[in-house]
Amino acid sequence: MVLSVPVIALGATLGTATSILALCGVTCLCRHMHPKKGLLPRDQDPDLEKAKPSLLGSAQQFNVKKSTEPVQPRALLKFPDIYGPRPAVTAPEVINYADYSLRSTEEPTAPASPQPPNDSRLKRQVTEELFILPQNGVVEDVCVMETWNPEKAASWNQAPKLHYCLDYDCQKAELFVTRLEAVTSNHDGGCDCYVQGSVANRTGSVEAQTALKKRQLHTTWEEGLVLPLAEEELPTATLTLTLRTCDRFSRHSVAGELRLGLDGTSVPLGAAQWGELKTSAKEPSAGAGEVLLSISYLPAANRLLVVLIKAKNLHSNQSKELLGKDVSVKVTLKHQARKLKKKQTKRAKHKINPVWNEMIMFELPDDLLQASSVELEVLGQDDSGQSCALGHCSLGLHTSGSERSHWEEMLKNPRRQIAMWHQLHL
């Protein structure tokens, strides 16, 4: 029993040593058969590592050269190129002028820093001349005068003339006024003109007018006037042809009128002739004053808008007493002879030319618009507080002149404000 313990220990020691020697032999044999397989990556050839590309570096080699050049700061805001206007060189004085240039009154200053040679914007030079000055530096006034023409000056004082031709259709019972031409003076240039014709008989009167034409020395209308008239009323009827003008403020005035009898003796039918127009005495130059207003109609809302803007040259017997008092305008909406509604503007101080700038709105169906009208009455307040009329006017198809044309323009142009001046009547 005592002998067996040392034997066991000796066997274990020999077995361990044999195992270690066998392991070392196997390791040496593996290294001999595969000499490079067991090397770590860091033990491999460093040249091979340089030849292999990696994810972090590229196999190509770059050459970086460093140079020092001045860097110019770039402005955040770039201003566009500004060019001066090119003068129209047409005068012979300018064409024959040998030396002219744009001179600056400021002395040139030295640049703070040298500019780069490629900066064309900073080195750009202005080559266009903005102004052309004479050699002596004095600009002379140029005055263009027209040669005096006695014949042309005499035509300014001549009365306007109207060319016309009368025809009558017995089957239709209509009177035709054709070949309308007007010869007027040129001192009222810039206005429009039209011809208005009216026939008065025992039963009443009918009117018709042409379209607006630019007023010239010789104005011609391609259209004519058609006036209904019974044949038995020809001997007693009177035809009035009126030449009217309209300025840019839509103010209508009478340039002249011509009265003709239709009995067939004074004016033969079918013959064209000239007639001298006479100034009408029906419309005074001042009257009771004028009022400026605009009207418009909104079909979708069935609303009639009347804007009272201002008045001027208000005249009446009590004008001096009412000067400085309150003045207002009463607007009445009528359908035929029935008054539908009336409204009044605010009061303004009577200074001959009062200003309101106030809008009045009426509810009016579309089917009642044709037979409706608007009446305006300018009212002044005296010392006792009583209101007195300074003038009135009416707009509608039942009226004539500018009052009728204003209403017709409103019907033709819905949703559009149309302003006109109208004469006030006492």
UniProtKB/Swiss-Prot annotation:
SUPFAM superfamilies: C2 domain (Calcium/lipid-binding domain, CaLB) (SSF49562)
Localisation per UniProt entry: Membrane
Main location: membrane
Residue ranges, Vesicular side: 1-6
Membrane-crossing segments per the record: 7-29
Pfam families hit by this protein: C2
Lineage: superkingdom: Eukaryota
Cytoplasmic domain ranges by topology: 30-426
Keywords from the named record: Membrane, Repeat, Transmembrane, Transmembrane helix
GO CC terms, sorted: axon; dense core granule; exocytic vesicle; intracellular membrane-bounded organelle; plasma membrane; synaptic vesicle membrane; transport vesicle
InterPro entries with a match to the protein in the record: C2_dom, C2_domain_sf, Syt13_C2B
CDD domains per UniProt: C2A_Synaptotagmin-13, C2B_Synaptotagmin-13
Quaternary organization: Interacts with NRXN1.
Family stated for the protein in its record: Belongs to the synaptotagmin family.
Protein name: Synaptotagmin-13
Native source organism of the sequence: Homo sapiens
